[in-house]
Design a protein with these regions (language model features):
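Short juxta-domain linker segments that transition from a proline/glycine-rich
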Residues: 1-181
Length: 181
């Protein structure tokens, strides 16, 4: 991809992944675990002492790409958080290594900012493509955000930020909704 903002690049990479799998126009909720399996990635849980680390993505010659979800991280304990973290790690495995090059990426507070922003945007677009969002009315208050986030199986903040990034809500509404969640 040409040089661009990490979030824009993440959105574009997710759109490419969805189109490649004929899921971009689908208004159905993505089974990210199945997509991960189809990509040949194994997913396991691990109990890391550092609770800030959400997951580890590993790939390289001689072994199958893998994601290890840190069961001690609070985000990974919810279905919505687990789906987002898995989609985020899938971005690292698909796009943060050249063919045949090894990758060891831990998602935590000290990970490279641009790489993490791109993976976050990838995860949001993968889980909330336009065809899925357009199927539902844009939430106008916190209760509608909670309801739609539960329906779409994503986090409330993920939903609000993605709606803003996609132009469904303005900056004022975004701030109001985030303050009230």
């Amino acid at each position: 991809l040409p040089e661009c903002a990490p979030a824009t690049q993440g959105y574009e990479l997710a759109e490419q992944s969805l189109r490649k799998r004929s899921r971009y126009e689908s208004p159905r909720i993505l089974d990210v675990e199945r997509m991960t399996e189809e990509a040949g990635v194994s997913v396991s849980s691990v109990a890391l002492s550092d609770t800030d680390v959400k997951a580890l993505a590993l790939a390289g010659g001689g072994f199958r790409p893998a994601v290890f979800m840190n069961e001690r991280n609070p985000m990974v304990s919810s279905e919505q958080g687990r789906r987002f973290v898995l989609a985020h790690e899938l971005c690292h495995l698909l796009h943060d290594r050249s063919y045949g090059r090894s990758l060891a990426m831990a998602t935590g507070p000290w990970a490279p900012c641009g790489v993490e922003k791109r993976a976050n945007a990838f995860a949001a677009m993968l889980l909330l493509p336009p065809a899925l969002l357009e199927k539902h009315p844009t939430p106008k208050n916190p209760e509608e955000v909670r309801s739609l986030a539960a329906t779409l199986r994503v986090g409330k903040r993920t939903l609000v930020n993605h709606l803003f990034n996609m132009g469904y809500i303005d900056a004022f509404r975004r701030e109001r909704l985030l303050e009230s969640l």
